Amino acid sequence: GREWVTMFSKENIATFDYVFTDAMTWTDTKGRRMRLWMPEEVFVDDKDDFMDQLVGQIVGVMQDEPIDMYVNSTFLPDILQPEYDTLWTEERMDKVIQAAVANDIAIEINARYQIPSATFIKSAKAAGVKFSMGTNNTDKNLGTLDYAIQMITECGLEPDDFFKVVKK
């Protein structure tokens, strides 16, 4: 959840090589706490309203939390997955991309969920966003980065397009 920021002092956070998070746990405007990967905890009364709230959460995380990488970047709950390309409009993608640029935050290319889309990655690359690769897996597929490798080729990513740890 969002409370992780209060669980560590600023001094402790400053000692980390890097910090990553997502917005997969949040509370909607009706006060309902959601964990987006758990279908029974997701509330979608109106798809566009949900998406606008989700984008607002993502942008808020990028603006307000001391992170280096944003992971599970364009994750949608199961109920919305079939409409991924429709719901992730150019305007919504641009808000997330601009927040990443403004706050110098890398975006994860997630091999497990196969997100973000090539369209998002190409737009983010053009805007100067850096990338990382990850899986969010806890099973035998941990470390399997096939989708990320595919996106490197498809989107023309080069080594300089990737996040690099800077020793503090």
Task: Give names to the regions the model predicted.
Residues 84-168:
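Charged catalytic cores and adjacent phosphate/nucleic-acid-binding surfaces used
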Residues 1-102, 157:
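Extended substrate/RNA-proximal surfaces in nucleic-acid metabolism proteins
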